[in-house]
């Protein structure tokens, strides 16, 4: 009982002392402001124009996510392209992400940054890549089959041991003289 009371008093004391150290608004500094959050789904052309202006887009280019209950609201549906596809020599405001200030961010930006998914077109088409892969696999299977049918072994001599072919260690009679063993130099 006394330990629980002491713990409760210690927690209250810690809360009182940290109030003076930590600024009051520090806990709110990481939240998104209301104007950063997506608004409701635009139903009229005027709402679409206002949402396009909010995201620094032309009305012709603005297309919101479908209103399917996922909570996207008026956020623009940007093309699913990675940051790799953007011009690396352009003077971006944020060169690591290849983005400019005020530019709308893709909803799945964490998936399309440069060290994740690369959606840029490949220089070789898929059918050519598949032909190369299956050709290599077929060649390797053929080579393994040839190695299995026609085995190749290097000729070897009998195993050579030092000290007269380990005569005593292999159970030889210590009273008899072992036969001399000829060792071959390679």
Curated annotation (Swiss-Prot):
It is found in: Mitochondrion inner membrane. GO terms for biological process: aerobic respiration; mitochondrial electron transport, NADH to ubiquinone; proton motive force-driven mitochondrial ATP synthesis. Keywords: Electron transport, Membrane, Mitochondrion, Mitochondrion inner membrane, Respiratory chain, Transit peptide, Transmembrane, Transmembrane helix, Transport. It holds the Pfam family NDUF_B8. Residues 1-28 form a transit peptide. GO terms for cellular component: mitochondrial inner membrane; mitochondrion; respiratory chain complex I. The chain crosses the membrane at residues 133-153. It is a single-pass membrane protein. It comes from the Eukaryota. Its main location: mitochondrion. Complex I is composed of 45 different subunits. Belongs to the complex I NDUFB8 subunit family. Accessory subunit of the mitochondrial membrane respiratory chain NADH dehydrogenase (Complex I), that is believed not to be involved in catalysis. Complex I functions in the transfer of electrons from NADH to the respiratory chain. The immediate electron acceptor for the enzyme is believed to be ubiquinone. This is NADH dehydrogenase [ubiquinone] 1 beta subcomplex subunit 8, mitochondrial. It comes from Mus musculus. The lineage of its organism: Eukaryota, Metazoa, Chordata, Craniata, Vertebrata.
């Amino acid at each position: 009982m006394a330990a629980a009371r002491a713990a409760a008093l210690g927690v209250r004391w810690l809360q009182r002392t940290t109030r003076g150290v930590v600024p009051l608004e520090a806990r709110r500094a990481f939240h998104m402001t209301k104007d950063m959050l997506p608004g409701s789904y635009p139903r009229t052309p005027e709402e679409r124009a206002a949402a396009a202006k909010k995201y620094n887009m032309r009305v012709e280019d603005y297309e919101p996510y479908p209103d399917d209950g996922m909570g996207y609201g008026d956020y623009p549906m940007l093309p699913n392209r990675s940051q790799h596809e953007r011009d690396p020599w352009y003077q971006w405001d944020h060169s690591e992400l290849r983005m400019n200030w005020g530019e709308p961010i893709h909803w799945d930006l964490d998936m399309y940054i440069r060290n994740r998914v690369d959606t840029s077109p490949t220089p070789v088409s898929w059918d050519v890549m598949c032909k190369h892969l299956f050709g290599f696999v077929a060649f390797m299977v053929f080579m393994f089959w040839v190695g299995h049918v026609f085995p190749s072994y290097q000729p070897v001599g009998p195993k050579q041991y030092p000290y007269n072919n380990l005569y005593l260690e292999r159970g030889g009679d210590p009273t008899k003289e072992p036969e001399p063993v000829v060792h071959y130099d390679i």
